Amino acid sequence: MTTQTLLIELLTEELPPKALNNLGNHFAASVAEGLEKAQLVDGAAEFTAYASPRRLAVQVKNVKAVQADQKIVKKGPAVANAVKDGTPTKALEGFARGAGAKIEDLTIIHDGRQDVYAYEYVQTGRPLGGLLEDIINQAVKKLPIPKVMRWGSSTFTFVRPVHGLIVLHGGDVVNVSVLGLQSGNQTLGHRFLSDGEIIIENADSYAAQMRGQGKVVASFAGRKAAIQTALEGQARRLNATVAADEALLDEVTALVEWPVVLEAGFEEHFLAMPQECLILTMQQNQKYFPLLDQNGKLMNRFLLVSNLQTEDPSHIIRGNERVLRARLSDAEFFYKQDQKATLESRLPKLANVVYHNKIGSQAERIERLQSIAAHIAKALGADAAAAGRAARLAKADLVTEMVGEFPELQGTMGKYYARLDGETEEIAEAIEQHYQPRFAGDKLPESKIAAAVALADKLETLVGIWGIGLIPTGDKDPYALRRAALGILRMLMQYGLDVNELIQTAFDSFPQGLLNEKTPSETADFMQARLAVLLQNDYPQDIVAAVLAKQPRRLDDLTAKLQAVAVFKQLPEAAALAAANKRVQNLLKKADAALGAVNESLLQQDEEKALYAAAQGLQPKIAAAVAEGNFRTALSELASVKPQVDAFFDGVMVMAEDAAVKQNRLNLLNRLAEQMNAVADIALLGE
């Protein structure tokens, strides 16, 4: 059966730029999935997604014009139950009626267990046109669109008004109706660079015709690559690097159909402002690409991506420079105004900034942060007074003009204003870094003072918000407590502090009775659960569970423990020791009295005497290895007692009739369990 390329295009008004690439990929994948399910392609569909500001399209290779005929076999009742005394039973008659067949049309087949009646027929394949309308409509319905709209007198809804529909199979139009539009082969090109309608001659010529006649690079990936190449080329010419992240590049790609990269500039005096402010203004407000020199310093040149190609782009450049100049002038004004007051003098204004109405203002919060940060700094061996000072000033920039205009600069502007106020560099850096880590993979605070303030900030948030009942549920976490917990955990894995003690310190900083009394224990459990999530990114679940079963309160040696358990798990003796440990734990649950020391005089059998001797010899070795942080050695020592453990369980009845002997054997197993689980609960390995 011959196949041809299928093309589908929805011509729209300008689509949301931040969602464009996702919409294009979802639409293409859904169409391809529909074709696969309808068996209009053999195997996995080979498709290309297209997405530009005014269109979503998909091109699928090797699509059939008609489904292949299918042999259908409907199975009915067993032969043994289908005929009685030569007469068809009601079961057989009902099957034939339901299948739309006569009894004489039925056949007998073997279904692998028995002979059954069956109705076999050939289902004629349906044409592409009879299936495609539903496939496209389903693809449209599945698009991840949070808000839809209606347009004109239409009752149909979509993310933006849709004005055209192309459906081509090879060079032939496939007649379908989608979103109230009849399919055709006409589309529009670039809004300004293209004239009139474009007739797509063939599904395979779509991208080339859109580029040549329409001045549209239809492929999102193609436009992005072209923009990136042009940006890098311009930057090299200026001996600079482009300051841009993937999100900005994606957004700009979604704003243009015919990208042209241009160079522009601004006055040097603006460089006196913090470069973070200038970069944010250019990237966020104007979608420009700032340039950095070889030392990472901002230049007064930038790159912009225009959607127009002209012989003389100077008017485009001047227009963009004029807009940016106005933006930077506003920022410069805010910056100068802010310098008229110190951070310290701004603190009273924090009383008017509500943190949460149940736990007070930012001014009240600052009091708590100071005490928590000073406590943590002291525990870290850092300057408690400096940490307290940094915490005192950490939120002062929230009431500055600059942060009011650019909230993303909180902390950063505090650093610059602290320097201007004569604060130490360590305090200034701590003010900026106390928000770190802001997200997964973000860097940690660089100094102990900064870490103390960062820990204080996140602990106070976690404990305070949790304590008033705003607990994360499902996908709802308005105060980002999960992120705060992960940030705390990452820092504690670097610094050897007791997580439960820190939680209690944060809890005690609030007025008595303000927070739920269960908050410390609940947040500790929450942290333990988040720790498991964090560690399972790098280690198998059973290894993480084994280490966390010990409920470690200091996390700075977690990585060493996890690595040691991973090595132990590979030992030949590991599986048997894990099973034995599980058996030991189950037996210990049956103890009638408190477990204590082993009484050597009650050891009766050679096997238990041998195990006791082995445990006695093992104890100092494991204790020394754990004390030195040599967890691999501690775990590897366990392999030496496997013969004695095996012999004990093979030859000794633990639950003896003599109560004293039974208790002594349980005491022995408890002694063994303490050593086996000194690093991790190895009974959990393999589960």
Swiss-Prot record:
Biological process, per Gene Ontology: arginyl-tRNA aminoacylation; glycyl-tRNA aminoacylation
Cellular compartments annotated: Cytoplasm
Enzyme class: ligase
PANTHER family per the UniProt record, alphabetical: GLYCINE--TRNA LIGASE, CHLOROPLASTIC_MITOCHONDRIAL 2 (PTHR30075:SF2), GLYCYL-TRNA SYNTHETASE (PTHR30075)
Family to which the UniProt record says this protein belongs: Belongs to the class-II aminoacyl-tRNA synthetase family.
Subunit structure: Tetramer of two alpha and two beta subunits.
Protein name: Glycine--tRNA ligase beta subunit
Organism: Neisseria gonorrhoeae (strain NCCP11945)
Encoding gene (name): glyS
